[in-house]
Amino acid sequence: MAAEIRLFTCLNDNFGYLIHDPATGATASVDAPEAAPIIAALAREGWTLTDILVTHHHGDHVGGVAELKQKYRCRVVAPHDRNGRIPEVDLRVAQGDVVKVGGLLARVLETPGHTLDHLAYVFDDDKAVFAGDTLFSIGCGRVFEGTYPMMWDSLLKLRVLPDDMRLYCGHEYTAANVKFALGVEPDNPALQARAAQVTALRAAGQPTIPTLLGEEKAANVFLRADEPSVAASVRLKGADPVAVFTELRERKNKS
């Protein structure tokens, strides 16, 4: 049976996610920005939390872990954070590991850059990737702990996933990302189409997530740093993709 995924808002602009296996009743929360919205979403669905899949240690992704662990006695799956910033961890995972949520299988990708410990969880059978703060719709995360080459390599790991894979990211940043991207590629038809879609969704009070990776590959300038047209738009014609990505990210930091 196909996984059931529920999306809701946490904190200010974080997304909360539940992924449920109807065959076994297992339910995972991807990250736990705060406990209350997750508890409410579980109650609405009549589900019980069995797992928390942590993408990285930032407080707006793990702030609800301890309370949820106490309430549900759920398993906490997390990266190898050497500084102990993720509470209540039961299972540490790394690149290539597979996590079971009931009968659902999540393949672990290490995607460092935003933080050194960052992970993405890929549910191949269900065509869903939970990318945390590495890849956003029409954007990417800031590089806080890693390096720009590291972040570019992480984006490439996500870019090779199938076009029909649904992207679930950590924040609702799409409108701001679109505004920046249009300044880089104003004539990109895929970006123009996504911009119109985002405007309509936000006007209706709807989330802009999930999006398809195929759409991101066509419209997300950060995934397109190795495209000659993108390099030319930032006056780096012929430059290495890492240099182009670095310039894009530095510009976005200042926007």
UniProtKB/Swiss-Prot annotation:
Belongs to the metallo-beta-lactamase superfamily. Glyoxalase II family. It holds the Pfam family HAGH_C. Zn(2+) 2 binds at D60, H61, D133, H171. CDD domains: hydroxyacylglutathione_hydrolase_MBL-fold. This is Hydroxyacylglutathione hydrolase. It comes from Rhodopseudomonas palustris (strain BisA53). One of its GO terms (molecular function) is metal ion binding. Binds 2 Zn(2+) ions per subunit. Pathway: Secondary metabolite metabolism; methylglyoxal degradation; (R)-lactate from methylglyoxal: step 2/2. Gene3D superfamilies: Ribonuclease Z/Hydroxyacylglutathione hydrolase-like (3.60.15.10). Thiolesterase that catalyzes the hydrolysis of S-D-lactoyl-glutathione to form glutathione and D-lactic acid. Coiled coil: none annotated. Its EC number is 3.1.2.6. Keywords: Hydrolase, Metal-binding, Zinc. It comes from the Bacteria. GO terms for biological process: methylglyoxal catabolic process to D-lactate via S-lactoyl-glutathione. Monomer. InterPro entries: Clx_II_MBL, Glyoxalase_II_hydrolase, HAGH_C, Hydroxyacylglutathione_Hdrlase, Metallo-B-lactamas, RibonucZ/Hydroxyglut_hydro. It catalyses: an S-(2-hydroxyacyl)glutathione + H2O = a 2-hydroxy carboxylate + glutathione + H(+). Zn(2+) 1 binds at H56, H58, H114, D133. It is an enzyme of class 3 (hydrolase). Its cofactor is Zn(2+).
